[in-house]
Amino acid sequence: MENLNWSELGFGYIKTDYNIRCYYRNGKWGELEVCSSEILNIHMASTCLHYGQESFEGLKAFRGKDGKIRVFRMDENAKRMQSSSRGIKMAELPVEMFEEAVRKVVKLNERFVPPYESGAALYIRPLMLGLGQQVGVKPAPEYMFVVFVTPVGPYFKGGFQPSKVCIMREYDRAAPNGTGTIKVGGNYAASLVAGEIAHEKGYAAVLYLDPKEKKYLDECGPANFFGIRGNSYITPQSHSILPSITNKSLQQLAEDMGLTVERRPIPFEEIATFDEAAECGTAAVIAPISQIDDLDENKSYVIAKNGKPGPVCESLYNKLRAIQYGDEPDNYGWVTIIE
């Protein structure tokens, strides 16, 4: 792509050539369709527009030094989308169909996969919408599955550099037994006000506390949180956190590095004991945290005392990216090569 400066890409939408679509009607999924239009034609009474019957996923494709294109853990995204469907009574898309759609959309748009080590990747966005004209609150009779792609740079402007986050108890991203564990748009809509306030104050994200008691660490903006203390990788266990595929992968890599992995409720007072902390997810990969400001208690916790990423975060980041780009062996079968 001669007109794209790969190293200067932000995390935004750039038009590509094709997307994939599939419809669920009369109790079954149809065939995958290739489309070049960016526009979806849906009825104004569709449940996705009124009652939030919508779910989505996010994954990436990487071009390796060998020129091959690799997609990271798409089977996990397929299974998580099924979980989201169960959570809001949508039709479940078979894992095989999800994977076929991803393979096809990446292959059709392979000229948009950024070159090796440009710092950019091809972001893949699967999306499911409830269709069918209804005014009452009930599950949709029909569904549309869409996958589009766009080349992206780092999610955070600083890239792999520590940034500040804040705690604000006034806001929650999900209810205690609500939809926090699934990937639906409502969770992100609920985070917009707090997120904008945080950005206006100069923070990269909000570190939420649990919505029930406000005692434990929860999600960190649109990503999972983890802390490093000594030889331990510590990440929250909660009924309102999305199970991050990146976090799951990092836990395995941490164990491979000899760290003890702890998944448990983390009292927010433990922040003061962390040697390192970060948020992690498909979009951010790993975004180290330099400082956590508790705006309600007027306290600051400095994590990165020298202003640089910690050694464990840096090792995990380099290891994960090396697997994604094919620079290190894929010992766990996480990568799919697009032929």
Question: What residue spans do the PLM features occupy?
Answer:
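Charged, gly/pro-rich active-site loop segments
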Residues: 105-119
